[in-house]
Amino acid sequence: CLKLLLQQQPVARDLRQISAALKMITDLERIGDQAEDIAEIVISGQVNEGEELLRDMAASTIKMVTESVDAYVKHDTMLAEKVIAEDDIVDGWFDRVKHTLIRRMTTDPGEGERAVDLLMIAKYFERIGDHAVNVAQWVIFSVTGMHKEG
């Protein structure tokens, strides 16, 4: 990207796309890091792969990431706006998971370690959703020149 900036002298739109891409790379890298953290917890054996509590949250988060990348590829600000709105759904899933796990721990103290692992996974999914929102916000910036704070 730096070579492109120096050699091609991009105009405003090109410069916005380059700077937005650089910002998105950071968010995509963090998504990968958090996916790795989720995998480590699952591999540790404390969590069943098909844990019902997290299935819908995971699906919503994966959808957000996919749509944010699609919005970038297609320069689709409407899809980016949709991703931003979907963050409330993932935040709602996190709250439900958290409250369910608190109830589990109070009724069955032996569930403590497993519940903490599930809560960590839920928090990682919630953060992945936040990074998908960041990508969507940078899509809007790259197309319109306006940076939408979420």
Describe the residue ranges of each PLM region.
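Cytosolic, long alpha-helical scaffolding segments
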Residues: C1-G150
